[in-house]
From Swiss-Prot:
Part of a Scar/WAVE complex containing brk1, scrA, abiA, pirA and napA. Residues 1262-1289 have a biased composition (Low complexity). Residues 1290-1308, 1321-1336 have a biased composition (Pro residues). This is Protein pirA. It holds the Pfam family CYRIA-B_Rac1-bd.
Amino acid sequence: MSVDPKQSKIADVFERCDVLESFPFHDDQSEIEEQSPSIGYDAYDKSLNYTDRGAYETQWSEETIGMEKMEEVLKQGDSFINMVYTYRSCSKALPTVKTAEQVNKTQIYEGNFEVLEPEIKKLKDFMYFQKDTIKLFCDHIKKLASTYDKKKETISASESFINYLVRILDLLAILDALKNMKACLNNDFSFFKRATGFLRKQMSGTEDQTQENHTLYLFLANQNSITSSLKLELHNIDKFDDILPMIVNQCADYLEQEKYILPSEKHCLLRVMPFVLFLIDENDSKHNINKNKNLNISRYAKIFKKNPVVPLYGDMQITLESLVKRSPHFDEKAWGTSTLDSKSALDYEIIHVLDQTRSLYNEYMARFANMVNEIRAAKARGPKEPLPLAESDIQAITLMGLRILSDWTSRVLQQSAWKYSKPNNDPTISATFDYERVVKFNYTKEERTALVQLIAMIKSLASLMMKSETLLQPILRKTIHQELQEFVQINLKETIKSFVKNNPKKKDNIKLEMSQLKNISVDWFSGFEPAEAVPNKKSKEVEEKVQIPARAVPPSPTQLELILTLVSSLMDKKKDFSSDQYRDFEAFSSKAFFYRYLLSLSSSIISITDLADLWYREFYLELNNRVQFPIETSLPWILTDHILESDDPSLIEHLFYPLGLYNDTAQRALLSLNQRFLYDEIEAELNLCFDQLLYKLSGKVYTHFKTQASSILLDKPYKTQLELAHFNGKLHTPKSRFDVLLRQKHITLLGRSIDLCGLLAQRQNNTIRQNLDYAISRFEACDLTSIVELETQIANIKLTHKLLSEYFDIDPFESIFNEINESTSLVSYHGRIVLHIIFELVADFAPNYTFNSITQRFIKAPYTFTEELKRDALPKTNPVFLFGNKYLNAAYANSIELYKNFIGVPHIQSILRIVGKKNLPLIVAEVLRNIEIKITNVLSPYVSELLQGMPASTKLPIYDYGTEGGYGYFQLKLKDIYIYPDLRPEVLQTFRELGNSLVFMNLLDQVITQTDSYNFAKAAPFLGITPETWKDLEPSTEDPTLQSPLYSQLQKLAQLLESRPEVAKSSQSLNDMVANAWRADKFYRPSEQNFSLFKSVLQRFSSILNIVRHDWSGAPPDNGVICVDSSTEFYRLWSALQFVICWPLSNENDKSFHELFGDGLMWAGCSLIHFLGQQYRFELFDFCYHILNVEEAAAVRSDKPALKNFFKNAQIIKDINNQIFSILNTYCPPPPPSNMILSPPATEQAEQFIVTTTVEEQSIQQQQQQQQQQQLQQSTSNSGSSLSLSAAGAPPPPPPPSTNGLPPPPPMAEYEMSSSIDDFAPPPPPPFGMPPPPPM
């Protein structure tokens, strides 16, 4: 009774399953690794081991019993192979008894016995197993020999049975080779014997154990003991030399007809052939392989020459020629020359067949993928939709894929065996052990590349086929069922009818076999065999329409073996069938042989593509007496590292195929070898390899994107010229295929799903931090000229971060930069860059650089008066952290070198871009603080001392003295100042520091103005400001933001969408956009006030001078107006210093004051004079100016070289002074001037002038009164009348109000305000800066 799913609870299950099919279980991640094994039910179970043989009645049922026993022996033998191959010596870790008198020797022997007894028991079981296996094999050979027909040269055995005998022989050969290889078996047994001998008295049954141990000792000690025992037993069997050749010939037939799929089957056939020949051959003439008629030596020689080296097990291999040479009757003439050095050995090297392999891969992948896509498209159209390809074609294409995989895997394993047999014995190689010579140093770069590509082709094709198994398996099973039924119900049925008709009473055995074949495999449409149709009277022929049920029901493993056995038995009776009938049997047999592989497609693919042998190295561990080898010698890691180090971009997509070999290795360790310690070793090695992979891959990825960013940022014309001249295309980003690799979010290794993208993102985060720290550390170890390099590196890192962000989820660059720059730490919120800039400005830039007003640049002074500055050590050069590679580093170094020898506008622009305006107040404040310290602590004492040392009279000589007289006069007067010991290292050095600091602030202000103008020009269109609207703007109380295009258009759109809510899905997001537009407009709209950083700096500088203003302004003049002959004001001292600066050099090799200190010296002096209100008195009474005026008025010019040099220096300084005063007057002009009317004295004996002041303009008078009132409020001690002022000193220009956010200056010091002739100045020109804002 069937269950209706719609009317039962199962309907819900079906519905849920249908829903599951709609879920996207696969992402868009590209497949770059082997297919992960899935857990599922295998409908075609091959593990039944003929337990269902009783269901089929055939004459071969008895044979299946023997095959069942041999299958059990093979399974047990595999366990012994695994045990012997993976055996590790226990005696190495056990303590030994060193002396006979040792106290604890009993405990040591008991412990050794307890540890070794289980292992020795395994060895005894192994010894007994090989005896039983030899006996079993010989019994089967004896039974076959009894059925041997010498005339027909046939035996009563099927191909399947002979295949089992082949596998038994291969098992014995492998066990013998492994036993010979493992010397540790004898070592452990010797320890065990020593312990047993000491503890013999305490044990029971020692005599039996002694004999058993002796037998085991002989078994382990004798080489080839298993082969010798087998050979001895075989030679006691009659006609064995007639049976064994059939085994060899069947092996040769299978190899020539390629009747195998698994690589292990091919290698088994190759290993057994020379082994059987050795077993047949003996020293006597009766058993001579050269004279045995059933053996074809030339045929075997061709096969051996084509495959001279065959994998044995793991890292062991055998040479077929060496096995044959062990035969007593080996004839080199019959076998031919050695094959190890022949041309056929080139077939082992994959590199020679890689091109045709790649071509075959591309062709088959396209064909298979097209087939799968067409099948899926047909299934999608409907379940009854016919397939686009014939089902037999689908089967043929799938079988072709298995054959291709088998051939490629065989090539990989055979090349590995070839390398093991041909180690690299170059004496120049520094190999620590033999394993390095067969693996690490035995593969060239080209061979590694070829091996990687072939492994990738194997794994990718296997992955594609396994993914399509669920789609193909029903079709394959249906096709197999159809072919089998067509053969049985059509071909076999006709053959039976014909055979019965021709042989009505003969050959009943053949009839019985055909009848059994039909009964075993037939599946009638109606459930029973239909009756034969009666022929018509007109025609003797009968037309039958055979109906074959379309079922996806393949034969069981036992059923399939019996079918093949019966067909093979019928084919042996070739003479009893016609040629057509025999061809039908042959065609079906050739197809049916591969059914077992197609019916278990996944397990077949897994077995075919198992490359675990590339990792196992137990033979070489035993040979080199080591516990394990380092990962540098492991072939999977060697191939992975080769991909990472290779310049071939196509290899990077194959990165996880070599690493996936660890999956095969771990699979074998757990499920086949059953050794947990091997899995632990594999897991530990994989962990190391994966860490190294992440480290190297992360570096490679970062280097690639770093190079790409450097190439993008490099000036294009400059890059083109460099490539033409030097680098030849090496400045472009190298090609790579990281896109696929960087999107991998679930890589499977040892059953663990790994998010490669996430792990790489973590490392990229760290690498960016390290790169930023490296760039800042380099800046901290260099002077201020490296700020351009720092900006270039930061821009490069920022672009690298942007490129990486396309693939990785990494932290924002601003947060990373702030973290590394320590601008958000608890220790400092200013940042390392800002602090180092301040340090360089104060400690190196101000005292050690000279300014040139013409070039507007600072250069390093030829001689410095300060101690050598100690900076942090320069970090070790890292080409990747610079600009990616050596070529780009050289290109950028050439461009950065242009900014290394000076400090100018480019450097200040870099400072502004790096630190931003938010950090400028700190820099300005620290520079001004340094100025204040220098004026207060250094300059003030020296100026006071020098003023006291000035000559009593500094009256300017009259013009009649001429230039020489005037020059000599001042030389004599100022000689003491010239020879003042602290003049250069202290006085002028301090003036230079002040001047450099002021010039730096001036240049910084210019850069800020340019930047603001550029930003305004970019923002103006969005603010609605154009040249036309700018001119026509009138003052208005309305907010200009309301009329800007950016805000007004968004505001209108928001209002429109608010009125139509059905259109807008998210009104809140639109309101946020409007609010952001408002903020942006307010941020970028220019202010009405014209801000100036330099103006604020000068204001602060003026307030600093209040500390020394009274001392440097001198005493009031005796005449009430001005003192002409002598003065203690600062400008007189600066005139003296300026004259000393222009003093000609006595030695041409000496450096002048101007060369040593630069124009910053004049900036300091002029700024002090300007803000002390002494500019015009300085210009009137300066010594150098006076000499220049005398020289200009002289009728005859002086021709003395010293005077000429003086005139030249004085004129240069005068021009510089004029330029400086012009700038200072522009930014901080003096107060409006007041006219002084000097009335003549009433009498000739008048002792003083009467000064009366009249004010011509009412506005001027009001302004002076306001200033006086402010001064009276600040200082209560200030007295005097504004109408009667002393002319001893002019008041300094008051600082303008602060407009840049800097703190207000301290209150001015108390001093007497007075007006003088210096108060007159022309109106200042308008300051240059941002265009004036529109009136409100």
